[in-house]
């Protein structure tokens, strides 16, 4: 059966049951902060997958990355909401500067520019590491929901990644592809919980 209902009220209906919606045993899937808090409140009455936070992306890049692609991918997450996180970790100061300039240019053109700007102001960061090993350490420490590896040797870098919800390899493996049709699923650990949680599975 399919019920057209959403938000915290849907979580309550599924957890406790109503006249028209039967009680369920497990609630899974992402939602906004109200859905996340509702899932936290009903945990114990029903099983849940996880309490997901705002969307996150970390792009791990070197000097070979295309700054327009990197900027676009960062903004693809920043547009979700004002609490979304978009982080670039790179070994190239030149790339960092170009990506910063490109994000500023893109924000002015986008319909959700105000939301994106607030997200970037609050949770957007560009980190420049001295070495790729330092950059990889930063990525593993942050343990982002989505990790893009845009380097000259992405498969080699991937072997050193321990903590990430989903990994996208190469400049043409854009994170939105995983959100909408190429990824195993859209329910991924956030807020550093990729260190000890896995994506939703059976």
Give the residues covered by each predicted segment:
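C-terminal core of ALDH-fold dehydrogenases
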Residues: 141-202
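Conserved NAD(P)+-binding/catalytic subdomain of aldehyde/semialdehyde dehydrogenases
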Residues: 2-85
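Short acidic-hydrophobic, aromatic-tinged amphipathic segments that line or gate anion-handling sites
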Residues: 2-6, 126-131
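Short, well-ordered beta-strand elements within core beta-sheets of diverse protein domains
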Residues: 57-62, 88, 122-130, 143-149, ...
């Amino acid at each position: 059966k399919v019920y057209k209902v959403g938000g915290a009220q849907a979580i309550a209906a599924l957890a406790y049951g109503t006249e028209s919606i039967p009680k369920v045993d497990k609630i899974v899937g992402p939602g906004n902060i109200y859905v996340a808090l509702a899932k936290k409140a009903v945990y114990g009455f029903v099983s849940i997958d996880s309490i997901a936070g705002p969307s996150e992306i970390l792009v791990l890049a070197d000097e070979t990355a295309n700054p327009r692609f990197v900027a676009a991918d960062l903004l693809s997450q920043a547009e979700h909401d004002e609490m979304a996180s978009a982080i670039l970790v790179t070994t190239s100061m030149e790339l960092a500067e170009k990506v910063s300039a490109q994000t500023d240019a893109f924000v002015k053109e986008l319909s959700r520019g105000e939301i994106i700007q607030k997200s970037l102001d609050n949770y957007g960061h560009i980190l420049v590491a001295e070495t790729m090993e330092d950059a990889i350490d930063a990525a593993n420490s942050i343990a982002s929901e989505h990790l893009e590896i845009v380097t000259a040797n992405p498969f080699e870098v991937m072997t050193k990644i321990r903590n990430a919800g989903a990994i996208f390899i190469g400049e043409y493996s854009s994170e939105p592809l995983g959100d909408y049709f190429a990824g195993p699923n859209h329910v991924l650990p956030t807020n550093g919980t990729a260190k000890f949680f896995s994506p939703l599975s059976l």
